[in-house]
Regions:
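Short, well-ordered alpha-helical microsegments
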Residues: 17-20, 43, 93-96, 119-120
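Residues at the starts of beta-strands that form the adenosine-phosphate
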Residues: 7, 32-35, 51, 107, ...
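N-terminal subdomain of nucleotide-sugar transferases
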Residues: 1-38, 42
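Short hydrophobic segments within beta-strands
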Residues: 10-13, 36, 88, 111, ...
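Active-site-proximal region of nucleotide-activated glycan assembly enzymes
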Residues: 106-152
Length: 152
């Protein structure tokens, strides 16, 4: 039996969520990885050396905007074949990768944003309602479904 190599999809929106993800570089740089994020000056300049798939940012109040993400996310999954997905949010970029992960039995790990001091983000709440565990950066937010990992 051959052992499957580990490949990580790093999924996040531009800005603070992207910065939080780059803070994990000591971890993910040890693995084959690629990005699914939004295109802007920050992401383009910092991902010159990495494989990146850029998708449009959707909005919960306009659910049809998620449709534009389906093809690029499918392409990324088909080409890259991730074994794990790590997301720092937000759901505006991570929802479609999460749904595909559920359909294909890919492990999805969400680290809720540090800026959410009380409670969880909308996407974090959605994941909890779907029966998923999330990782929180605040000790006060920890419980059986939200595991405290400390600030990243």
């Amino acid at each position: 039996m051959t052992k499957q190599r580990q490949k990580i999809a790093l999924v996040c929106t531009k800005g603070g969520h992207f910065t939080e993800m780059t803070n994990l570089s000591d971890f993910y740089s040890c693995y084959d990885h690629f990005w699914i994020t939004n295109k802007n000056e920050q992401t383009e300049s910092q991902l010159r050396e990495d494989k990146a798939y850029y998708i449009n940012m959707a909005h919960f109040k306009q659910p049809w905007t998620y449709l534009s993400q389906i093809v690029p996310v499918l392409k990324a999954f088909f080409v890259e074949k991730p074994t794990h997905i790590i997301s720092t949010g937000s759901g505006r970029t991570a929802l479609i990768p999460y749904l595909f992960a559920r359909l294909t039995n890919i492990r999805f790990m969400h680290i809720d944003t540090f800026s959410r001091v009380q409670g969880y983000s909308k996407f974090g709440n959605f994941l909890l309602k779907m029966g998923n565990q999330i990782y929180t950066q605040w000790k006060d937010s920890a419980n059986s479904k939200a595991i405290y990992i400390g600030p990243i």
